[in-house]
Amino acid sequence: MSYLIKESDGYRYIDEGQGDVLLLLHGLFGALSNWDGVISHFSKNYRIVIPMLPIYEMNPREAGLEALVAFTEGFVASQKLNDLTLIGNSLGGHIAILYTLKNPEQIKRLVLTGSSGLFENGMGGSYPKRGSYEYISERVAYTFYDPKVATKELIDEVFE
């Protein structure tokens, strides 16, 4: 499915449905399309908000969990979101944990899927290689139990 990507206050995001807010945070090699099933199912009863995390746009020396939590805090403030159900996948789950610890008054529920955790202090041994289609392709395929799920279309979306 294709959803309108909105832009405001320097943030790019999807905002679908009405009701209580489900804020979804994608993973390191995630793409917005990873949330298609969630959006189509839950947007009937909830407002689904998905910011595009600036994982590859950030300066590698400044990029990290703290910066991504700060980005999320800025996004939540700019959109005036509160009483959130925060759902994070993979790296998005790690960001969600740290965000919740810093801002517990804003969180109604926390949902983690395949999350990295509190006892990890970074994004692995090295920062992802920018501009390497082969590297991104390998990492996206590695994300799934069945690597065939990592279609060229999905890899292209993550690479962009």
Name every feature range the model reports, one short phrase each.
Residues 27-37, 48:
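Serine-hydrolase catalytic-loop signature spanning alpha/beta hydrolases and amidase-signature enzymes
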Residues 130-160:
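Conserved alpha/beta-hydrolase catalytic His-Asp/Glu region
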Residues 8-14, 37-40, 49-91:
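Active-site loop/oxyanion-hole signature of alpha/beta-hydrolase fold enzymes
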Residues 29, 53-57, 117:
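Alpha/beta-hydrolase active-site loop signature
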